[in-house]
């Protein structure tokens, strides 16, 4: 049996842009991630308030620990709104992020928000008097298939633990933190993350995605574009599955590209395309909610300036980020599946791990096709961020090295030039 590995280690073709050092949202400088995982009680009958408990909290700190005073540009997108991210309307209205982002189960949003508010008031006693009030950003998914969700077992201590555990570097994935009880396409999933480092010709920016993945049905699962779910659904049709809920997904996008709020809103929309790549169709009862931020511009809470200047990546230069965020989202979801192990919980419900051996065999069977169109992710030896243009055809459609004044505004392509007259054909009269 294959050990649990990340999706990239299965040799999957996961896009043309390279990941960052850790292939995680923490590759964006200053972003920290921490978890608090709660697993109590043996699998068995549900006893509300007692267990079994399979839940937790994940904390994303956008610029280490000072997001309240050094706010960042923020944005969001809601594909289907049968879910919740508290504080999201303010992020969209102001275009600013001013609290950490926390992820947990549906019925613990209030407790986590209250705990985060308490922590921030301790750190900044002027909140509510000297400073504005805050609305912590807390996202949720329903983990009730495995967890005693009505018992509301997440406490302030767990929020503090997740914040204290937040660090840079590799991010634990799968059944950890807020993802402890989450399921994707009828397999155990949870937290997953991935990143992309753009080549210097596209700005050299880093972009990372972290998901709490909890959506879908097995037959819809696609891995690197392959209908793996249909294959596995037939082989595993004897296994019980979650039937009363389609689930949801919360995604967090971070980048060091200098994007303004309207651009972050647009970037978040492309995350939804990445979610669709793995098999989501955003069902009636699901919630696909995306929050994004850029670390490139800090908006200080205290300043004597009336006008504050911010850097801006021109809209016609954003396309590579759109492509990269789709790739990173797809890989983050697959990483959540690849990392998670089987779990049992409420009422003895069992959720299997994604069978990596079967996935590998399915992918290997199609490898001759991949070999004709793409390299596997680890074949290129050029360091991330230093690659030439990914392919010659791209330069023909879009000259990234042209000065902004040399391109048509919204289209981002060179102004047309009059073609040179063809050389005279001395033999033309002889035909």
Show which residues each predicted segment covers.
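Alpha/propeptide regions of enzymes that mature by internal proteolysis
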Residues: 1-387
